[in-house]
Amino acid sequence: MNIMLLGAPGCGKGTQAEQLVNKLNFIQVSTGDLMRKEISLNTTLGLKCQEYMNAGKYVPDQIVNQIVNQFLQYNNDKLIFDGYPRTLEQAKSLEKMLDLYNKKIDYVFYIDVNEQILIKRITNRLVCPLCKASFNLETRKPKQEGLCDFDNTKLVKRSDDSLDKVKIRLQTYKEQTLPLIDYFKTNSKFIEIKADNLSAEQVFNQIKGELKI
């Protein structure tokens, strides 16, 4: 069984993916993490990703699909797709890639959050460069200021989490990703979660309830 988490940057997809991995043994497919890995290794694909990310723009479909395809060769079941696909072209490409392994997207969860809440969340976000855990100065403060709860690594702010770049990302999301909602409503089991006033745990319980596991 494979599932997808849809929603704007900052809606909590990463937090839900973390819960699903830790509590239900799913495997997270975070294209952000996959791209950052390519960047850290200074691969050709990574250098191309870096150029677009530094400008606050989405990486083109062709590059992202290549990175995902590399991953699917070794992992193609009990996956969580977090932040990918972002466009109809990516969605159709993903379905074709999964079909090679007789797999599909079984559930799509759309986490809907107000834009002003999203901006506040993202600009207050800190991440651990070692284990990739995410914290927030407003909603999920680390136990010790500036340090990761899990490995004591100094937390950092992602370069694409500045206010200007966040606004660009949200606008691009509206233009490119919102059409996916209609597409997946007819191609998978689609569940919308209104999360403005829900805690991360409440969102997780809704997801778990739908999965019936």
From Swiss-Prot:
AMP binds at residues 31, 36, 57-59, 83-86, 90, 158, 169. Keywords: ATP-binding, Cytoplasm, Kinase, Metal-binding, Nucleotide biosynthesis, Nucleotide-binding, Transferase, Zinc. The keyword Cell membrane does not apply. GO terms for molecular function: adenylate kinase activity; ATP binding; zinc ion binding. GO terms for cellular component: cytoplasm. Residues 30-59 are annotated as: NMP. It is an enzyme of class 2 (transferase). Its EC number is 2.7.4.3. Zn(2+) binds at residues 128, 131, 148, 151. Pathway: Purine metabolism; AMP biosynthesis via salvage pathway; AMP from ADP: step 1/1. It holds the Pfam family ADK_lid. It is found in: Cytoplasm. Catalyzes the reversible transfer of the terminal phosphate group between ATP and AMP. Plays an important role in cellular energy homeostasis and in adenine nucleotide metabolism. HAMAP family: Adenylate_kinase_Adk. Belongs to the adenylate kinase family. PANTHER family: NUCLEOTIDE KINASE. Monomer. This is Adenylate kinase. It comes from Mycoplasma capricolum subsp. capricolum (strain California kid / ATCC 27343 / NCTC 10154). The gene is adk.
